């Protein structure tokens, strides 16, 4: 499912003394089946943009098109349930939203709230519990008896049970250790590929943006500064650092190497293998 934002703007408490501009003239599209990342410093508008993707927030200027549904600023919208069923959002610390007596009931809550029968919802729960790396026996347990990592997977299963066409991830690995983060990100990537999802990742991790995204949207103060491939965006690491952002370790090491040997590699490397190949000729002759 394709998503397109055109001249999108948003103000909190518009036309009041407390009006605050959050987004301004945002123009970006997310192709069907693509994996995109949105990066930017805290307060850049990432999460506000994210909440427009399933109409949790409505634009105050411009429009957003999700599939065949168009949402235009100032136009009253009806039947948003269908849109919200197609766009699943995994927020930071999603486990905080667990509340039911059992894991099964928690996973079934969303689908049943959108009109799925209890029987079909239970079938979905049995399917998605495996998709998040857990087993069926956990369905009868209380979610509050589980480990933190298991609780997060259960919460993610609840989103997947809605059978979304678009998956929006808002810092989905917040609070996890490096191993847990890698497991969760690999899980999302596999789901993205297997289901043909349109995936939008909001992240502070430049490593994840470089590793998984096909396209990166760089934001500052509610506006889009750059849209490009990871290689294009990370080709100017100093500009990212000036914005208060980090860069992937491989990109940082490439910069150190180029300065030390006074050379310029042929491309911005995103993996260790790429960097090793690019460095090899210089290392073989002991530098430039």
Curated annotation (Swiss-Prot):
Gene: ecfA2
Record-level GO BP terms: cobalt ion transport
Keywords: ATP-binding, Cell membrane, Membrane, Nucleotide-binding, Translocase, Transport
GO cellular component: ATP-binding cassette (ABC) transporter complex
Transmembrane segments: none
InterPro entries: AAA+_ATPase (IPR003593), ABC_transporter-like_ATP-bd (IPR003439), ABC_transporter-like_CS (IPR017871), ABC_transpr_CbiO/EcfA_su (IPR015856), ECF_ABC_transporter_ATP-bd (IPR050095), EcfA2 (IPR030946), P-loop_NTPase (IPR027417)
UniProt topology in membrane: Peripheral membrane protein
Statement: the UniProt record of this protein carries the keyword Transferase: no
Location in the cell: Cell membrane
Occurrences of domain ABC transporter (ranges): 3-246
Keyword ATP-binding: yes
Positions bound to ATP: 40-47
Subunit structure: Forms a stable energy-coupling factor (ECF) transporter complex composed of 2 membrane-embedded substrate-binding proteins (S component), 2 ATP-binding proteins (A component) and 2 transmembrane proteins (T component).
First and last residue of the signal peptide: none
Function of the protein: ATP-binding (A) component of a common energy-coupling factor (ECF) ABC-transporter complex. Unlike classic ABC transporters this ECF transporter provides the energy necessary to transport a number of different substrates.
Single GO MF descriptor: ATP binding
Family: Belongs to the ABC transporter superfamily. Energy-coupling factor EcfA family.
Enzyme class name: translocase
Name of the protein in its database record: Energy-coupling factor transporter ATP-binding protein EcfA2
E.C. number: 7.-.-.-
